[in-house]
Amino acid sequence: MTGDGQGPGDGQGPGNLTTSISWAGLPVLVVGIGVSGLAAARALLARGARVRVVDAGDSPRHQGAAATLRALGAEVNLGGLPAGPGDSALVVTSPGVPPTAPLITGAAGAGIPVWGEVELAWRWRGGSRWLAVTGTNGKTTTTEMLGAMLAAGGRRSTTAGNIGTPIVDAVAAEPPYETLAVELSSFQLHYTHTMAPLAAAVLNVAPDHLDWHGGAAAYAAAKAGIWRRPGTTAIGNADDATSADLLAAAPGRRVLFGLDPAARPRPGLTVVDGHLVDDAFGGGRLVAVRDLVLTSPHMISNALAAAALARAEGVGPAAIGAALVAFRPGAHRNAEVAVIDGVRWVDDSKATNPHAAAASLAGYPSVVWIAGGLNKGLAFDDLVRDARRVLRAAVLIGRCADEIAAALARHAPDVPVERADGMDDAVKAAAAFATTGDTVLLAPAAASMDMFRDYAARGDLFAAAVRAREG
């Protein structure tokens, strides 16, 4: 994993770049012209850096972003990546670029620092406090919950990072934010070297993105990088073995959250007598579970993690409770689309891996499951084995439909299975299986790009097909 020793400011790289660097005229190569790359390039240009941007893509979207940056003074080259960094003193890479890319290995071999947009933002953060969230699943929901708690507590705050808003934009806001709720992926953490948030949570760790990281150990290490500094309060999940194991090595204060108050060591935030309880920060009872809209185990777990982060920042128990009572999840995350003839239709298109789909399925007693898409090299056996008791039927789409069907045949042979060519057909097939009291759940357990632009487009098409049935 790219760690402390490879970040400028740690004594590495030409010019020993530090937080007090003069950016004027500094040659910086920005790799990728997506959301974070575009934001990083703009921020660097605003500070007077000499910016060159490269991207392997050359679509109309790329061309539009390139035109914007050229107008601001950047050099932009599309349609391929160079073999090396040229005369750049710093490389700022988009998170999707793997560390094995020749451009990245070439820069590292030449002693040129490689940062991500998060590293830039941390060095430009001013006086803002950061509360950071990572994990295989639940990051966005937890970050949204945390943002709601901060707002309820009267903080001038916002959410940023993998949730949508680039962090370099958030730290540049005027007037400045007091606190940022930051969602970070393993990709982003790999290219982040000096960040030391006030508190950080690792929600869970399950196999994902293993091809990018090169294995499960490197993936877990990237997640653990979120709390590598001793000044960070590290928050781990007692119900997730890997998160709890990683927490044991954190150098700062350690806090556990979890659903079982009898677990050992006992979680500092847990559920007791139907209430979310904070013993770690002295908050006592925070809220009754019965007062929450979403009470599935993984949603309660997310709420405990968000509460731990908010309490670490000093948000009061009453504000946390009020925020959770009012909280509604964003689109495509266990979002109820409609109830038609006693059948509930739920969009969890954000469940893009088996671990996320398992958490979603565990929240419903009788499910017609719509699943499938582009597999990330993961197995579906554990998912099907754990979910078989709630499955009434499965409707499969996408490239990995056969893989899921094979897992169903092995572990849930009595569950009816039907394949569908697209979302309209999938909704039609699911409606034929579903009866009063069932939930039709889109929890694909796979990525979307084989059939759809992204998970949001997949969820939107599901919702449109469902609403068309309402007449």
From Swiss-Prot:
Compartment(s): Cytoplasm
A GO MF term: ATP binding
Pathway: Cell wall biogenesis; peptidoglycan biosynthesis
Catalysed reaction, written as an equation: UDP-N-acetyl-alpha-D-muramoyl-L-alanine + D-glutamate + ATP = UDP-N-acetyl-alpha-D-muramoyl-L-alanyl-D-glutamate + ADP + phosphate + H(+)
Domain of life: Bacteria
InterPro entries according to UniProt: Mur-like_cat_sf, Mur_ligase_C, Mur_ligase_C_dom_sf, Mur_ligase_cen, MurD
Broadest EC class assigned to this enzyme: ligase
EC number: 6.3.2.9
Keyword vocabulary terms for this entry: ATP-binding, Cell cycle, Cell division, Cell shape, Cell wall biogenesis/degradation, Cytoplasm, Ligase, Nucleotide-binding, Peptidoglycan synthesis
One GO CC term, this protein: cytoplasm
Binding residue positions for ATP: 135-141
Entries under Pfam families matching the protein: Mur_ligase_C, Mur_ligase_M, MurD-like_N
GO BP, sorted A to Z: cell division; cell wall organization; peptidoglycan biosynthetic process; regulation of cell shape
Cited Gene3D superfamilies: Mur ligase, C-terminal domain, Mur-like, catalytic domain, NAD(P)-binding Rossmann-like Domain
General function of this protein: Cell wall formation. Catalyzes the addition of glutamate to the nucleotide precursor UDP-N-acetylmuramoyl-L-alanine (UMA).
Family: Belongs to the MurCDEF family.
Protein name: UDP-N-acetylmuramoylalanine--D-glutamate ligase
